Amino acid sequence: MADTERTFVMVKPDGVQRGLIGDIVSRFEDRGLKLVAGKFMQIDDELAREHYAEHVDKPFFDELKEFITSGPVFAMVWEGQDAVAQVRTMMGETDPAESAPGTIRGDFGLDLGRNVIHGSDTEPGSAEREIGLFFDDDELQDYERIDEPWLYE
């Protein structure tokens, strides 16, 4: 598969509690992305601070940390052509009220604080940093989907 990349995606506690993991995974698989890692986990305060380091000094950080540590999350790594951009498009805008119908947040998000999903941003190195926070190298699987020759030139 040429020009593939990996990206980090997390179903947040509100998405887990509402039983949306299967719907979200199906959307990415249907798009042709390949799941190369996934696990349920509980984020602790330290990981929340590392993951959201750019927000630590912002007024909303404590509320964000409280939410992201309030219940289990489903952390994933997806692979495919332009995976970061594809996932960001499929997620929709951060605020579900501004997300188009058909996007994950447009269909499932309730409000800015309960927007169901996180995905790596397009800043260089962002996806790699987040993948490294949540997964060890030996947790990432390399395999070929049987439909890859049909999906990619």
Curated annotation (Swiss-Prot):
Task: Cite the NCBIfam families for this sequence.
Answer: PRK00668.1
Q: Which residues are noted in the entry as ATP-binding? A: 12, 60, 88, 94, 105, 115
Describe its function: Major role in the synthesis of nucleoside triphosphates other than ATP. The ATP gamma phosphate is transferred to the NDP beta phosphate via a ping-pong mechanism, using a phosphorylated active-site intermediate.
Compartment(s) where it occurs, according to its Swiss-Prot or TrEMBL record: Cytoplasm
| SUPFAM superfamilies in alphabetical order | Nucleoside diphosphate kinase, NDK (SSF54919)
Q: Which family does it belong to?
A: Belongs to the NDK family.
Q: A single Gene Ontology molecular function, please?
A: ATP binding
EC number of the protein: 2.7.4.6
InterPro entries (alphabetical): NDK-like_dom, NDK-like_dom_sf, Nucleoside_diP_kinase
> Which domain of life, per UniProt?
Archaea
The active site consists of 118
Q: Quote the catalytic activity from the record.
A: a 2'-deoxyribonucleoside 5'-diphosphate + ATP = a 2'-deoxyribonucleoside 5'-triphosphate + ADP; a ribonucleoside 5'-diphosphate + ATP = a ribonucleoside 5'-triphosphate + ADP
**What Pfam families does its record include?**
NDK
Q: Which GO terms describe its biological process?
A: CTP biosynthetic process; GTP biosynthetic process; UTP biosynthetic process
Q: Which residues cross the membrane?
A: none
Q: Which SMART domains does this UniProt record tie to the protein? A: NDK
Q: Does the keyword Nucleus apply?
A: no
Write out the GO cellular component annotations: cytoplasm
Q: What is this protein called?
A: Nucleoside diphosphate kinase
Keyword tRNA-binding tagged = no
Which gene is the coding source of this polypeptide chain? ndk
Give the record's keywords alphabetically: ATP-binding, Cytoplasm, Kinase, Magnesium, Metal-binding, Nucleotide metabolism, Nucleotide-binding, Phosphoprotein, Transferase
The protein's required cofactors: Mg(2+)
